[in-house]
């Protein structure tokens, strides 16, 4: 049985690292808003937009129109397309509301894939940034499959998604509520 758990850990970034986080969140927000606007435009023309097609169009524009995006991890400008596709799938299935534009400071976050993450006790290594101090060590042993960096009340957090082979003993009694 495959189990995936998340562990949200408070980060202790330097000023430079926090600036990087703000920039990556801004790029993720900009990309989402660009993709949503383009989706609406194409849909109004009678087309059936797809996230991968929009991503290809965006990547063709990026070197010329948005070169500043290369200053942070590539995931900041890739993952919003996947999230938008999921949001529209949920909308068309009647499971969610129509996707809306993102505003600065409202659920700021960005995703990082496991191929760009390294952990060392109370530190996480992020692409184009280096080692960032975590306030606690990861509680679960397993394969880290992704991370999401987010901001809440002027604090930065990393939510690590870990694939486990079995449920940790500390979680067995609270499995219904989550660990």
State each model region's role.
Residues 1-179:
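Nucleic-acid substrate recognition interfaces
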């Amino acid at each position: 049985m495959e189990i995936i758990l998340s562990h949200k850990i408070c980060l202790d970034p330097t000023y430079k690292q926090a600036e990087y986080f703000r920039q990556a969140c801004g790029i993720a927000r900009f990309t989402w808003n660009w993709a949503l606007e383009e989706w609406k435009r194409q849909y109004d023309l009678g087309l059936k937009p797809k996230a991968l097609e929009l991503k290809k169009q965006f990547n063709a524009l990026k070197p010329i129109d948005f070169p500043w995006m290369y200053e942070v991890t590539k995931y900041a400008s890739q993952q919003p397309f996947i999230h938008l596709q999921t949001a529209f799938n949920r909308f068309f299935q009647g499971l969610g509301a129509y996707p809306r534009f993102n505003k600065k400071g409202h659920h700021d976050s960005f995703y990082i894939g496991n191929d760009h993450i390294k952990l060392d006790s109370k530190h996480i290594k992020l692409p184009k940034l280096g080692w960032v101090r975590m306030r606690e060590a990861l509680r679960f042993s397993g394969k880290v499959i992704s991370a999401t960096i987010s901001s809440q009340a002027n604090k930065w957090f990393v939510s690590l998604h870990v694939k486990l082979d079995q449920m940790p003993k500390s979680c067995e009694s609270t499995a219904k509520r989550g660990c």
